Amino acid sequence: MMSKLGVLLTICLLLFPLTAVPLDGDQHADRPADRMQDISSEQHPLFDPVKRCCDWPCTIGCVPCCLP
């Protein structure tokens, strides 16, 4: 009985190797800074269309900043 289970386990591992299972480490990391570069500054909620720049804070990815 145990030898039959061993043979079955061996066949399963040969047919479906563990490397074929996707792991969490294989997924790309989420990069919010890269996503923010894809957004146009004119569509940013802090963009002032009259001044043609972004109000404070300037560290959230909206350029150009309105400097005083």
From Swiss-Prot:
Residues 21-50 form a propeptide. It is found in: Secreted. It comes from the Eukaryota. Disulfide bonds join 53-66, 54-62, 58-65. Expressed by the venom duct. Its main location: secreted. Residues 1-20 form the signal peptide. InterPro entries: Conotoxin. Keywords: Cleavage on pair of basic residues, Disulfide bond, Hydroxylation, Neurotoxin, Secreted, Signal, Toxin. One of its GO terms (cellular component) is extracellular region. One of its GO terms (molecular function) is ion channel inhibitor activity. Pfam families: Conotoxin. The modification 4-hydroxyproline is found at residue 64. The cysteine framework is III (CC-C-C-CC). Classified in the M-2 branch, since 2 residues stand between the fourth and the fifth cysteine residues. Belongs to the conotoxin M superfamily. This is Conotoxin TsMMSK-021. It comes from Conus tessulatus.
